Amino acid sequence: MERQEKANNAGHMVDVVVIGGGISGLSAAKLLNEYGINVLVLEARDRVGGRTYTVRNENVDYVDVGGAYVGPTQNRILRLSKELGLETYKVNVNECLVQYVKGKSYPFRGAFPPVWNPIAYLDYNNLWRTMDDMGKKIPADAPWESPHAEEWDKMTMKDLIDKICWTKTAKRFASLFVNINVTSEPHEVSALWFLWYVKQCGGTTRIFSVTNGGQERKFVGGSGQVSERIMHLLGDRVKLRCPVTYVDQSGDNIIVETLNHELYECQYVISAIPPTLTAKIHFRPELPSERNQLIQRLPMGAIIKCMMYYKEAFWKKKNYCGCMIIEDEEAPISITLDDTKPDGSLPAIMGFILARKADRLAKVHKEVRKRKICELYAKVLGSQEASHPVHYEEKNWCEEQYSGGCYTAYFPPGIMTQYGRVIRQPVGRIFFAGTETATQWSGYMEGAVEAGERAAREILNALGKVSKKDIWLREPESEDVPAFEITRTFWERNLPSVTGLLKIIGFSTSVTALWLAVYKFRLLTRS
């Protein structure tokens, strides 16, 4: 009776309702609209963009306080943004990057800081090589089907790091690598999931690099424009301040209800929100047990994104580009990038407070965070000019109730093999998008576009408008942002690990001892 009453009161009938007005949901809606499908996007916030958010004010002009970076091999977001009339610019790494470790700053160039200790170098080299080799054994579209899935999914990344690395230097940087890439701790995440995550982003070098990597570029005017321009195209088919609370697909049409009791009827639904947020929605019939269990087991990463503005880019006077990799437990920030505008105006440094540090520093006042960051930059860059910013912007994604955190949801140990296969499995006429469901650059804007367009094509296939083989389409490489192959040198490919070196030394010692024993024996027998 209740369903019939809701159906009678539903004032809007559409073909598809998309839950979530981030890049993924809007990409889905845009594609459906191009096929003549009557689509409606319901967004909980008073803005579109989801985990991308461009703030505009007189102090910053514009600033991305959420997802911002694009680069080679991220061909879908590059194609979509170009279609929407957006341009990219390169993040500055013309000068030296800085590694800060044990209270000292070391300038360097390249993706990773150099290591001068030969044993630590072997350890580092083996870490990246082993992670990439393990990733090659994981299918991007079905990591749970990896030959080692069960074994690796029972391990945390801390377990794996402890297993691979011998030196404290390598272990410390490997932990930072996890913090930076997935905004969570090594002991929290499944080794299988993290290895898959790095693999589907192109490997350890591609995911971590600025040049030829995931952080090479930003959008002129901000990444929020992607969603804003799609909303402009869709017009009144995007509704803000409409959190969805109820989805009933027990009848011929699906009934969708929002928090303010607006009712909509449709044939299909796309859920384009983080998996854990679907727990805020009441479903009828109830979700299948595996899906219900999955959404309770995928926490979000923790991050506070901080932008410090200065009168001038003083770091360039020291031949620094603004990128800092900071290995210090007491430091609030773990990594920074230059966030100066492409025309050189509004000099700024963007820094991430990550994982355990985000949790700790979220408890203090904004001004305390600002002071701690300024003190840190002054130490790392060796300049008191860092202590005198002209403006500070930040965004604590941990307090966003309609995101739950950033960048992405992560899989704790055991979850990928037990429940992972249902991540994008439709439930009746409900299909799932969101960057977490992507198979390339999941966690990035690229993954959001892939997932949204794939979910849209699943519905188009159900409607008989595209064939099943066209649900998953290969994206041509961007002509504007070409990707260059990442290769390893002969030594990077062939140097032994520390364990391998010890075995070589042990074998050599044994052979030498045996030779000496034989030599002495011969001398004795001759005499």
UniProtKB/Swiss-Prot annotation:
What cofactors does this protein use?
FAD
Q: Which UniProt keywords apply?
A: Acetylation, Catecholamine metabolism, FAD, Flavoprotein, Membrane, Mitochondrion, Mitochondrion outer membrane, Neurotransmitter degradation, Oxidoreductase, Phosphoprotein, Transmembrane, Transmembrane helix
- Disulfide bond sites: none
Positions of modified residues (Phosphoserine): S383
Which sequence positions carry the modification called N-acetylmethionine? M1
- Give the main EC class: oxidoreductase
Which reactions are catalysed by this chain?
a secondary aliphatic amine + O2 + H2O = a primary amine + an aldehyde + H2O2; a primary methyl amine + O2 + H2O = an aldehyde + H2O2 + NH4(+); (R)-adrenaline + O2 + H2O = (R)-3,4-dihydroxymandelaldehyde + methylamine + H2O2; dopamine + O2 + H2O = 3,4-dihydroxyphenylacetaldehyde + H2O2 + NH4(+)
Record topological domains on the Mitochondrial intermembrane side: 519-527
Q: Which GO terms describe its biological process?
A: catecholamine metabolic process
Per the UniProt record, which residue ranges are transmembrane? Answer: 498-518
GO cellular component terms, semicolon-separated: mitochondrial outer membrane; mitochondrion
Residues bearing S-8alpha-FAD cysteine are C406
Q: Note the site residues: Important for substrate specificity.
A: I335
The listed locations are:
Mitochondrion outer membrane
Specify the superkingdom.
Eukaryota
Q: Please provide, alphabetically and separated by semicolons, the GO molecular function terms listed in this UniProt record.
A: flavin adenine dinucleotide binding; monoamine oxidase activity; primary methylamine oxidase activity
* Chain positions of site Important for catalytic activity: C374
The record gives the membrane topology as: Single-pass type IV membrane protein
Q: How does it assemble?
A: Monomer, homo- or heterodimer (containing two subunits of similar size). Each subunit contains a covalently bound flavin. Enzymatically active as monomer.
Described by its record, this protein's role is as follows:
Catalyzes the oxidative deamination of primary and some secondary amine such as neurotransmitters, with concomitant reduction of oxygen to hydrogen peroxide and has important functions in the metabolism of neuroactive and vasoactive amines in the central nervous system and peripheral tissues. Preferentially oxidizes serotonin. Also catalyzes the oxidative deamination of kynuramine to 3-(2-aminophenyl)-3-oxopropanal that can spontaneously condense to 4-hydroxyquinoline.
Give the UniProt family note: Belongs to the flavin monoamine oxidase family.
What is this protein's name? Amine oxidase [flavin-containing] A
| Lineage of producing organism | Eukaryota, Metazoa, Chordata, Craniata, Vertebrata
